[in-house]
Regions:
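N-terminal low-complexity, acidic/polar interaction/targeting segments
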Residues: 2-245
Length: 245
């Protein structure tokens, strides 16, 4: 077992052994294709009756709700099975529509680990324990953040070129924890990768994962940019031939 696996095992055991006063019950909003991180803004349209009920309760009682990526099942219809690590969301804006639907804006606050799912209401709830990210002020976190910084700048530049849009970063945060979450939110990668980042035990682990993902994405973006001009010429075709778009 490597150090990262040992760290994850310790974190799992810490959650299981959490004192009762550190546990809380959260309404759970399982989502497909969304991994919420602390500090991330999440707009949602609420139309299912069970989630209208849930959000109305959160508004009235000023409760957060938990956002968790779906592991199995669908958003609409029968209850989906979520991953075990998610992020609590605080509602900051509500727009009520005439037909009872709502547009809300929420912000991710803190990570949690699901200990027990409950389905005794129209929507899922769960007993959860706080899952703080650790080792943000260590030398290792600082060293890894310095390794990630230039990759982030290169990534934004190549992504801008590939998407033909003007993406800019005014300034990268100095704090390794803030940088780790910013990169996690910004990376254009799949849900599996995003969930892996969310489940990282500490800042060094998250930054190390991000460094590897950035290296992979940089190679892909460089290839896309290098071959785009050749593909455009190929699509035009030589005189007398028709090439499909």
């Amino acid at each position: 077992m490597n150090n990262q696996d040992k760290g994850a095992e310790r974190a799992n055991q810490a959650s299981i052994d959490a004192p009762r006063d550190r546990l809380m019950e959260l309404p759970i909003f399982p989502l497909k294709n969304v991994v919420l991180f602390p500090g991330m803004v999440l707009p949602l349209r609420i139309f299912e009756m069970r989630y209208r009920e849930m959000i109305n309760r959160c508004i009235e009682e000023r409760l957060p709700f938990g956002v968790v990526l779906i592991a199995e099942g669908q958003e609409v219809g029968a209850s989906a099975k979520p991953h075990t690590v998610g992020t609590a969301a605080r509602i900051v804006r509500v727009e009520r529509l005439e037909d009872g639907r709502m547009n809300i804006t929420a912000v991710g606050t803190q990570r949690f680990r699901i200990l027990q799912l409950r389905d005794d209401q129209s929507y899922l709830t769960a007993v959860v324990s706080h899952f703080p990210i650790v080792n943000g002020a260590t030398r290792l976190a600082s060293d890894l953040s310095q390794r990630v910084r230039p990759k982030v700048l290169d990534y934004v530049a190549l992504l801008s070129k590939a998407a033909n849009v003007n993406l800019t970063l005014d300034r990268l945060p100095e704090d390794p924890l803030t940088l780790a979450f910013l990169v996690a939110i910004s990376l254009q990668v799949g849900d599996k990768d995003k969930q892996q980042l969310l489940e990282a035990v500490g800042v060094p682990e998250m930054l190390a994962l991000e460094s590897r993902m950035l290296s992979r994405e940089l190679l892909l973006l460089k290839y896309m940019n290098d071959t785009r001009e050749d593909m455009q010429l190929l699509n035009r075709g030589p005189s007398g031939y028709i090439f499909p778009n």
